[in-house]
Amino acid sequence: MDRNNLMQALYAMDWERIKTELNAGADVNAPYNKHGWTPFMWVCREFYEPEAIKAFLKACGDINSRNQYEEIPFLIAAKHRSSPQTLAVLLKAGADINAQDKFGNTAFVYIVKHPQAMMRLRVLDFMIDNGADPNIKNKHGKTVWNYAAEQDGLTDYLCVRLLEEKSDE
């Protein structure tokens, strides 16, 4: 099985070819570049449909694999505009919502740092509802709160949501 066939199908976003490669036993965990990216990681970055993630998990996608930046598929998906539904599939498969990359950042940090974080409130809600820790410090000593303070209105939103979450416990 030529791993390049799967990557060519992924680059073309040709779902029929992708399914053919998966059914033929393509290795979704084999790194395809010097940065340690796997086809499964690529799908987590580029495909936003939960069904695509499920297909790669069925093909034994490694939920805890890490690239050279120490990113796991969940963190990659969160960084790249994934929906709460896609993130839920990864969490159900065993992803660590608080996993940190080599810079110490979590998925929650990347979502808050996103230039359009206020447009991603559903994803922020998902992270809060699923126990993402806003107090984890990265290698610069910053937390979600530090990055939220840089975005108009985001700190207030997070405070209200986290207080609501705590009052439900």
Task: Set out the residue ranges of the language-model regions.
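A structural signal for the main folded, soluble domain(s) of proteins
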Residues: 113, 123-126
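Eukaryotic tandem repeat interaction scaffolds
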Residues: 66-90
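Conserved ankyrin/ankyrin-like repeat signature
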Residues: 17, 51-52, 85-86, 119, ...
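Ankyrin-repeat boundary/"N-cap" motif
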Residues: 1-8, 31-41, 66-74, 100-112, ...
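Leucine-rich solenoid repeat scaffolds
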Residues: 133-168
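Ankyrin repeat A-helix N-terminal signature
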Residues: 8-13, 42-49, 76-83, 110-119, ...
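Ankyrin repeat domain, specifically the short helix-to-loop turn at the C-terminus of the second helix
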Residues: 20-27, 54-62, 88-96, 125-133, ...
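Intrinsically disordered, low-complexity regulatory segments in ankyrin-centric signaling systems
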Residues: 1-24, 29, 33-37, 44-45, ...
